């Protein structure tokens, strides 16, 4: 047993843990990252979700998430605009290599792969060390970045698992009492992703064999409402490959999901989930033809990935975890938009100074925007809406994560940074998404490094110091306040981020900051910095603009060799283009600079000009 010491120990190499370790090390902390698998990145890579959701608007592409998109664009010449479920689809291998390269570039970051936590030592309510099969690591600060919050159970840190009734948090969508759904599916269903491949017309892919438990009737009608092509193109990847993460009678698996809490029973659940996906892939091949088979060269094979590897992700895509009982709990109403607004209220805490002075402090440290999305094999549930039309399409309304939700209520020297933060079951449907978890991890890593610098506990850390460190990071500055009209490249970005941190009561309900009148203007519509990280080549597309309804646009293509005469949905992720679309006259002839996504039937506009 090798004994190691560090300033910061990050347990788990998933989405949040990878970001946390990178950020802590970049800040200068001696950091050890211990991962169960040979790939870093979790949901974004080893779990196969190479079509991330949320934070797609340019103004929300900040921090490590924004840097990841930029690096994907640089390394994937085919661009990122392939499927229709996301604006960013990529080869999982490319994503994993990006994270590995970033880690390798940090000499004060020691990465150990192939180890899972087995014991946690807690002395006087303080986590002191974590034991793995071959190592014991003692650190000043420990970050639980495991997929299922395993350190919480091992260290007997108070946590939640499953549904809360409406009486607990007064959440509008929470159940009034237990019901068959809450009892059968205590948490959201995981999905074991598989990547399939089109071998080409006239080609025959190897047969996908039946798993030990095969019941194709479970998938009856899975894509009837979509058609074969649209079903496959949902998660289309480069190279005629398809991410299979299908929510409608597909490969979500939640039977006996409570078994994940038991190390002894977890393997049984994992086997069933893996077989469930294999059965679905076999059905796809049988119904759509033998030109479709497994993409067997995606994930590493062997060792820790005994159930996964090849075409199958190394582990399931976990949507929910054990969740710490933190200094505050993020609830459904905390992520819903303000009345007559399109952003959630900022999280406010009262900071007392002595007996007479107190002030309201905004402790936002990460930004998300995904709609509240819950997955249960039995189907959708009724949820309070948190979506809006923007840029010609539906998107989620922005919200923030409070720092206090990363800090356990009683336990010191510990932070959460995955889906294990202090959040209700209902709100978890929006906080679990990959870009936001990167942001949570980045904040946790920075907080841990600052605690080492300040020689303080996470609960004692000055949150304004943390926010300033995140905003001013020299490599990947990240937003803590969602501003829909201001990308991080804008010269006013830092000013308005700090302005609303200092004056949270002034935060606008529409998420739009005013233009300053100090001689500094926001970026122009033609600024190259406003081009999102989605494509490798842009096209000039001419056509007739049509407005079907509010924020619902099309373009009848008039001059394009490949697309002439076609009607494409016209969408954008750019604030300036969004504003132009709002005022463009129907039947106007326009030139659009953008990329065409044949899977989604849309033209993603980076700039638009009337002609």
Feature-to-residue mapping (PLM):
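Beta1/beta-strand and adjacent pyrophosphate-binding region of the FAD-binding site
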Residues: 2-14
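Conserved N-terminal/central alpha/beta ligand/cofactor-binding core
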Residues: 23, 29-30, 34-119, 160, ...
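Conserved beta-strand-loop-beta-strand element in the redox core of flavoprotein oxidoreductases
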Residues: 121-136
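Structural detector for short beta-strands of small beta-barrel domains
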Residues: 533-551
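OB-fold (S1/OB) nucleic-acid-binding surfaces
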Residues: 549-573
């Amino acid at each position: 047993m090798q004994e190691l010491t560090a300033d910061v120990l990050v347990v788990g190499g998933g989405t949040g843990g990878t970001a946390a370790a990178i950020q802590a090390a970049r800040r200068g902390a001696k950091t050890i990252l211990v991962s169960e698998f040979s790939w870093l990145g979790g949901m974004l890579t080893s779990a196969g979700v190479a079509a991330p959701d949320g934070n797609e608007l340019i103004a929300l592409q900040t921090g490590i998430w924004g840097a990841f998109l930029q690096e994907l664009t640089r390394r994937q010449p085919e661009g990122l605009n392939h499927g229709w479920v996301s604006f960013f689809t990529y080869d999982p291998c490319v994503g994993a290599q990006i994270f590995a390269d970033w880690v390798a570039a940090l000499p004060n970051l020691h990465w150990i792969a192939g180890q899972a936590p087995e014991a946690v030592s807690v002395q006087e309510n303080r986590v002191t060390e974590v034991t793995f099969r071959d190592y014991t690591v003692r650190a000043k600060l420990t970050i639980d970045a495991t997929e299922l919050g395993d350190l919480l159970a091992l260290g007997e840190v108070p946590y939640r698992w499953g549904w809360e009734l409406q009486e607990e948090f007064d959440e509008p969508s929470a159940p009034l009492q237990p019901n068959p759904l809450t009892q059968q599916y205590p948490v959201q269903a995981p999905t074991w992703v598989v990547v399939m491949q089109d071998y080409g017309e006239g080609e025959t892919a190897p047969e996908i064999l039946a798993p030990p438990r095969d019941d194709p009737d479970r998938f009856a009608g899975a894509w009837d409402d979509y058609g074969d092509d649209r079903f496959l193109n949902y998660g289309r990847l480069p190279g005629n490959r398809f991410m299979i993460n299908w929510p409608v009678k597909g490969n979500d698996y939640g039977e006996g999901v409570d078994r994940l809490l038991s190390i002894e029973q977890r393997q049984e659940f994992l086997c069933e989930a893996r077989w469930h996906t294999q059965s679905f892939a076999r059905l796809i091949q049988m119904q759509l033809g033998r030109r479709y088979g497994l993409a067997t060269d995606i994930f590493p094979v062997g060792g820790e990935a005994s159930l996964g590897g090849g075409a199958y992700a190394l582990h399931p895509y976990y949507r929910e975890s054990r969740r710490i009982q933190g200094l505050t709990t993020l609830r459904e109403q905390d992520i819903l938009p303000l009345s007559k607004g399109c952003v959630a209220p900022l999280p406010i805490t009262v900071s007392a100074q002595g007996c007479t002075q107190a002030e309201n402090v905004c402790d936002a440290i990460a930004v998300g925007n995904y709609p509240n999305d819950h997955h249960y094999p039995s189907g959708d549930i009724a949820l309070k809406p948190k979506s809006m039309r923007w840029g010609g399409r539906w998107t989620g309304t922005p919200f923030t994560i409070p720092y206090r939700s990363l800090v356990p209520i009683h336990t010191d020297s510990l932070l959460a940074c995955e889906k294990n933060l202090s959040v209700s079951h209902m709100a978890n449907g929006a906080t679990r998404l990959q870009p936001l978890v990167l942001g949570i991890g980045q904040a946790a890593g920075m907080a841990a490094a600052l605690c080492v610098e300040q020689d303080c506990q996470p609960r004692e850390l000055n949150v304004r110091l943390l926010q300033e460190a995140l905003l001013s990071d020299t490599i990947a500055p990240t937003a803590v306040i969602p501003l829909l009209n201001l990308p991080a490249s804008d010269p006013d970005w830092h000013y308005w981020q700090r302005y609303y941190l200092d004056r949270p009561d002034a935060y606008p309900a529409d998420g739009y900051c005013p233009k300053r009148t100090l001689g500094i203007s926001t970026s122009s519509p033609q600024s190259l910095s406003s081009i999102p990280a989605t494509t490798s080549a842009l096209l000039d597309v001419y056509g007739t603009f049509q407005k079907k309804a509010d924020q619902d646009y099309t373009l009848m293509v008039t001059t394009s060799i490949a697309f002439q005469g076609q009607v494409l949905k016209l969408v954008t992720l750019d604030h300036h283009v969004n504003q132009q679309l709002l005022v463009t006259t129907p039947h106007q002839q326009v030139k659009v600079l953008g990329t065409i996504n044949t899977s989604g039937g849309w033209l993603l506009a980076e700039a638009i000009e009337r002609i």
